[in-house]
Amino acid sequence: MTTAHRPQLEARNGAKGALVPTGTEHARLLPGHTELKARKPKNKTTSQIQTSSDAGSVDDSTSAGTNIGTGSATLGPSQVQKMIQPLEVEDKKDIKLVKKEDDSVSWGKTAFSRRKKVVKPEKFTNDTVRSQKHKEFLNRFVK
C-alpha cells in the first residue's frame, strides 16, 4: 500500500515537532472495545427460583379451567368445533374468489395469444443422409 492510501495524521509542512492538529481522527487511533461484557448467571439462586415459580403458578391458575370474568367452565371440544366450522367455510369462499381473480388474468387474453404462430423452417442437420434436401433429391432423381 502506498502513502496515498493512508490518512494524514500530521501536518504536511515540516511542523512535526510543533504538533499542529489536522482535524482528522483516524479510526485506527480510537479504542476498539470500550465496554466490558458481563457474564450472565448460570445458576439461579433459591430466591429467584421461588419468584419464578410463584409467577408461573399464578398464570397456571388463571388458565386452568374457568374464565375469571364469567365464572363459566372452558369450552369443550365439540363446542370449539362448532365455533370453528363457520370460519373454515369463510376461508374456503375466500380461496375460491382468489382463484376466480387469477383465472381472469390469464395469459390467454394477452397480446401473446393473438400473434399468429409462424411455422419455422427445419433446422440444419449435420447428417446429409437425413437432411430434407437429400430426401427431396432422392425422390426426384433416384428411383
From Swiss-Prot:
Residues 1-83 are annotated as: Disordered. The gene is CWC15. One of its GO terms (molecular function) is RNA binding. Keywords: mRNA processing, mRNA splicing, Nucleus, Spliceosome. GO terms for cellular component: catalytic step 2 spliceosome; nucleus; Prp19 complex; U2-type spliceosomal complex. Belongs to the CWC15 family. This is Pre-mRNA-splicing factor CWC15. It is found in: Nucleus. Residues 44-82 have a biased composition (Polar residues). Transmembrane segments: none annotated.
